[in-house]
């Protein structure tokens, strides 16, 4: 905490002080244990600290009492009160595994309770009742969670260490910002499949520089016009009438509340649209993701689109995208989309192969999908784009080549292509655990399928790589949503499950009632790293662009790295830029990760605060 910084404490000492201060706020604690039958038992008990020791006062009528007598497995939970939390879903909490010791009645027992009853007068009435007992609690190991991405493990010897989080937000092995010798040489053994795997390094590095603020504090920031005039709106519609087998994201099977959700979206558009900050913005991109936005009824889509146009200034060349499935579209909806400026559709195909469509739980056969895509292109004047997933169980090279051929034959304007990622909580994850589906991931198979799909489309000479997972038809799809994202543009997130950033504040909408807001206190430095991360999502990186963000010394280190990668066949190093090969695109997120580590001080010589180049000068303040 800020109040400790002036006292000369180390970071670990400050963390200990914060944790100790957190415990001091409590007069009771939630207690969990296990019954003799192995069932979890939960209750609560009055809690008191005296002369450096911790005590609870329990009653034999509690269900957990007999378990405490026979079971050493006990955990305490201290959790912030709802009334004082910034958001109920983000309450600070501390869990401790503990050992308990019954305090025998005697002089010490009476002394402790004499002090206990000063803070809890009920002790005076119950201390002499035989069914009440005083227990000493010895803290063992614990975990303190102080924010949505900030947690600390506490060892039995009271050492406090920060929990390292992966890009997905799950605890993972510590992401060392030092570059290993194998990484330096390009000897990768595990492939990073998504941008989040590499950009997560930046998020983790800077998460300490963020603080949670309230909605009212955010809207105070929005009272001023924006400095950067270009902006993006992202709208999330978390409803589907059929859930893909690989999906564990924020989606809901459709029910009767689409009308309520429409009302919610319109109210959000109005709320943000009236702020001076958003009024000063020219919206360059509107992107509806999900879920399946086209699951909304025609009149609901009209209300939503009309509200966007009424509340925001959309540029004449605004890219307006909706994600969709084929079975959720009809001619009436297409007419409404075009009426309100929708000029890009992203269709979740995933696979044309019958086997793949069955495994991924898709609707329609290959022939039906092909026919419906042709009809869509005939009736919709904008871009028609698709998503393709490869390396699903037992997929063959012939099947992925056929996917590429159909994309080319239909003249699809762009296609995303992702290697299948199994996420906890998806149907596919459950099937694998229950042995009803076998997934034997092989890196070499992943490579073969990736190369076969990519090279087949490139061989037509009608397609080119736009970024690591996006192939576009030449002269057609610009995919400005991802370009503006990589540039660090403001993205206003609307809808449950939506995430974005405006006014240097990260926003994530949890439900219709709650969102959390994390304001960055180190904006300039963090944004520069994000720009570097964005540069390395493309097949070509020009040195002139890179030098805007790094010192000459760091650039020289990176250039040596590029030559190593060139020797591995990942790229060609030209006089003015690097150009990734097919193999380099496959390893693109790994390459981006190593570059970011180098810039974060991974060579052991420089740290993040020293690498940036501003007006020809270097310095920590820049």
Where are the regions that the model predicts?
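C-terminal edge-of-domain segments
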Residues: 1-17, 123-176
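Flexible, acidic/Gly-rich N-terminal and inter-domain linker regions that tether
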Residues: 173-230
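Charged, E/D/K/R/S-rich low-complexity terminal regions of large eukaryotic assembly subunits
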Residues: 498-622
């Amino acid at each position: 905490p800020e109040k400790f910084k002036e006292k000369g404490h180390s970071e670990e000492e400050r963390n200990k002080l914060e944790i100790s201060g957190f415990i001091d706020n409590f007069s009771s604690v939630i207690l969990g244990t296990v019954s003799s039958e192995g069932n979890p038992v939960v209750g609560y008990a009055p809690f008191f600290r005296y002369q450096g020791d911790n005590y609870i006062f329990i009653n034999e009528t509690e269900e957990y009492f007999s378990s405490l007598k026979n079971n050493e497995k006990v955990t305490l939970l201290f959790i912030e009160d709802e009334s004082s939390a910034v958001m109920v879903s983000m309450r600070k909490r501390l869990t401790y595994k503990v050992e308990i010791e019954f305090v025998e009645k005697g002089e010490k027992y009476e002394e402790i309770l004499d002090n206990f009853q000063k803070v809890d007068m009920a002790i005076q009435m119950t201390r002499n009742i035989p069914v009440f007992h005083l227990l000493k609690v010895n803290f063992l190991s614990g975990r303190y969670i102080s924010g949505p991405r900030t947690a600390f493990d506490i060892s039995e010897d009271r050492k406090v260490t920060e929990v390292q989080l992966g890009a997905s937000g799950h605890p993972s092995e510590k992401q060392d910002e030092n570059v290993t010798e194998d990484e330096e040489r390009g000897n990768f053994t595990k492939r990073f499949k998504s941008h989040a795997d590499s950009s997560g390094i930046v998020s983790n590095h800077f998460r300490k520089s963020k603080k949670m603020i309230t909605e009212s504090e955010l809207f105070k920031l929005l009272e001023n016009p924006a400095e950067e005039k270009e902006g993006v709106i992202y709208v999330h519609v978390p409803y589907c009438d059929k859930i893909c087998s690989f999906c564990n994201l924020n989606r809901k099977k459709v029910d009767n509340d689409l009308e309520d959700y429409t009302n919610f979206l319109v109210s959000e558009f109005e709320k943000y649209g009236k702020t001076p900050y958003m009024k000063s913005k020219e919206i360059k991109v509107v992107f509806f993701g999900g879920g399946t936005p086209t699951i909304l009824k025609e009149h609901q889509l009209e209300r939503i689109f009309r509200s966007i146009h009424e509340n925001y200034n959309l540029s004449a060349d605004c890219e307006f995208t909706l994600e969709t499935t084929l079975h959720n579209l009809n001619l009436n909806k297409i007419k409404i989309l075009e009426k309100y400026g929708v000029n890009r559709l992203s269709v979740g195909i995933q696979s044309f192969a019958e086997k793949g469509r069955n495994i991924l739980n898709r609707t329609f056969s290959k022939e039906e999908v092909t026919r419906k895509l042709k009809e869509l292109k005939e009736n919709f004047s904008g871009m028609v784009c698709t998503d393709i997933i490869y390396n699903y169980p037992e997929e063959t090279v012939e099947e992925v080549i056929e996917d590429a051929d159909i994309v080319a034959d239909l003249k699809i304007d762009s296609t995303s292509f992702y290697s299948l990622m199994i996420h906890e909580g998806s149907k596919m994850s459950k099937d694998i655990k229950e042995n009803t589906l076998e997934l034997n991931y092989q890196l070499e198979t992943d490579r073969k399928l990736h190369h076969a799909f990519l090279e087949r489309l490139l061989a037509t000479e009608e397609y080119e790589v736009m970024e690591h997972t996006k192939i576009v038809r030449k002269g057609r799809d610009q995919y400005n949503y991802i370009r503006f994202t990589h540039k660090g543009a403001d993205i206003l997130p609307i809808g449950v499950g939506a995430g974005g950033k405006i006014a240097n504040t990260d926003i994530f909408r949890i439900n219709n009632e709650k969102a959390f807001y994390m304001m960055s206190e180190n904006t300039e430095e963090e944004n520069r790293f994000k720009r570097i991360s964005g540069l390395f999502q493309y097949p070509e990186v020009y040195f002139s662009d890179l030098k805007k963000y790094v010192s000459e010394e760091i650039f020289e280190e990176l250039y040596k790295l590029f030559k190593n990668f060139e020797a591995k066949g990942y790229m060609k190093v030209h006089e003015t830029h690097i150009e990734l090969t097919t193999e380099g695109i496959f390893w693109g997120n790994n390459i981006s990760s190593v570059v970011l580590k180098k810039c974060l001080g991974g060579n052991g010589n420089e740290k993040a605060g020293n690498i940036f180049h501003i007006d020809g000068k270097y310095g920590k303040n820049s």
